[in-house]
């Protein structure tokens, strides 16, 4: 219709222009990051911060960019769900509900106690404190995937803890909503828990009875585009459904991926979704950079610097403590603690809610938001420090049971194939001895918890050692 604004080409152009601009700038940021040997996440965050510094943040605050940023996190959680079949959730239940709850109690409880000790209102101390105990799913999972750590002990534990944190974030959002409405907290939390259990049950039923027939029907159609459309539909529709139920969109996306994880079509679905995940995640990280207020950094740089250092230092130390309490080794606890040592995108959402932000001084809330955003940007560097420190601590004598002369399996090289073999052997409690000639790969494998020796398998002398 001529009078319909949606049919006006100028209106359409104005709507999509911010997204197109960020997409083009994001490509440049990714290329620059690679040229500087930095993680692309740093480039995206830096781009957002630079645009904010130029006073252009408001140009990109539209609903389209926000929706694309949210979609990026949804696709990330959908991809994570693809790796967590029902069998794996049962196998990782100790990490998810045991280690995950322990980490939240230690880190979140400590931050809540710290806020209360500084005289902040109890409601703010509890909600903001436990929000600071959360880590960034988007950043951590991105790093884990980039490093090929999905199936190593540290990677599995990190993913499990993040799943529990996603559930905890939902409860915090419910608590913040009850605070805003003045309603009773316990009934609200109980309702949220019941909804989450119902969503999980629906995902289990979908996985058991509908996934295989659905994709079998699509396979008979023989059209690859339908696979792509179906994968997108499951990820987005699952998130939409939980969002309509008052839960987080990301929980629904995770459950959607989990529903497909046990099917024979998982690899195909993951292949179709990967490109969208990377594309939309770039919008999320740029949006985080845009949220940093440069004027605040200049005016209150000492406060922001102090809060940032305190956040990262305390978070890493508390995570390490949680690992040690969970009977992890010192090197493993250090690597995991540093990997999860940043703030969370959910914390940014919680601190932006008027019911929460209104309980503390705006200056403090702004400093917390800036500190969280900065912690996301420096996560690759902080994580590398933890990884190298763990590698040095692990450089002592190897575990005799798994890496001694009597180990029944010899692995040559710790490339992805070698790591996959080692993961399978460790999962089945079978000893192995791994050899790696490349020093960098040796250090990374050592830091990731593998039982590996530095040796050149092509040298005959190695076989007599």
Predicted regions and their residues:
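Transmembrane helical cores of multi-pass secondary ion antiporters/exchangers
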Residues: 1-416, 422-423, 458, 462
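A solvent-exposed beta-alpha-beta segment
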Residues: 409-465
